[in-house]
From Swiss-Prot:
Residues 1-44 are annotated as: Disordered. It comes from the Bacteria. The lineage of its organism: Bacteria, Bacillati, Bacillota, Bacilli, Bacillales. This is Large ribosomal subunit protein bL34. One of its GO terms (molecular function) is structural constituent of ribosome. InterPro entries: Ribosomal_bL34. One of its GO terms (cellular component) is ribosome. Residues 9-44 have a biased composition (Basic residues).
């Protein structure tokens, strides 16, 4: 059985990156929530 976690930085950024989050209304909501909570890192 192959490992379920196969690290890939390009996919990581594409799926969970800042620009991806900013591209949708709900993504911006996530960022706003993380800012309000005081997260040091907002996205991947």
């Amino acid at each position: 059985m192959k490992p379920s976690f196969n690290p890939n930085n390009r996919k990581r950024k594409k799926d969970h990156g800042f620009r991806k989050r900013m591209s949708t209304k709900n993504g911006r909501k996530i960022l706003a929530a993380r800012r309000q909570r005081g997260r040091k890192v907002l996205s991947a």
